[in-house]
């Protein structure tokens, strides 16, 4: 499969820098556009419970999520790819995660997740 070039919206890095500097942001949801060539910030969340965080994750659509765990001050990069996602879409998100991780300095942990149960102990 041919590798696609993924463009990263600058707001992805800007929001990450805010999260690192202890602004009110606790998580950043990144999504690819319909052409799978642009990664952008879908939404940011702050001051929410873990249950609300888990409920905000789409059960049938992939996302790249940056989550700040304030209890130990770790920043976790989560590649959420539900089991039902087509291989071509999973491949696009894999390329996007590689591209964005090159720009994000300060990620402490990386998780590949296919089942929300894996996130229940964040």
Swiss-Prot record:
One of its GO terms (cellular component) is cytoplasm. Its main location: cytoplasm. It holds the Pfam family Cofilin_ADF. Keywords: Actin-binding, Cytoplasm, Cytoskeleton. It comes from the Eukaryota. The keyword Isomerase does not apply. One of its GO terms (molecular function) is actin filament binding. Residues 3-122 form the ADF-H domain. Controls actin polymerization and depolymerization. This is Cofilin-5. The lineage of its organism: Eukaryota, Amoebozoa, Evosea, Eumycetozoa, Dictyostelia.
């Amino acid at each position: 499969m041919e590798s696609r070039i993924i463009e990263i919206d600058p707001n992805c890095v800007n929001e990450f820098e805010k999260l690192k500097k202890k602004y009110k942001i606790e998580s950043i949801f990144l999504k690819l556009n319909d052409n799978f060539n642009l990664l952008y910030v879908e939404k940011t969340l702050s001051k929410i419970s873990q249950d609300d965080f888990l409920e905000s994750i789409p059960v049938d659509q992939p996302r790249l999520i940056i989550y700040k765990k304030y209890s130990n001050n770790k920043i976790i990069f989560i590649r959420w790819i539900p089991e039902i996602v087509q291989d071509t879409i999973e491949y696009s998100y894999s390329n996007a995660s590689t591209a964005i991780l090159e720009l994000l300095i300060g990620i402490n942990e990386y998780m590949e997740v296919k089942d929300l149960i894996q996130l229940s102990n964040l």
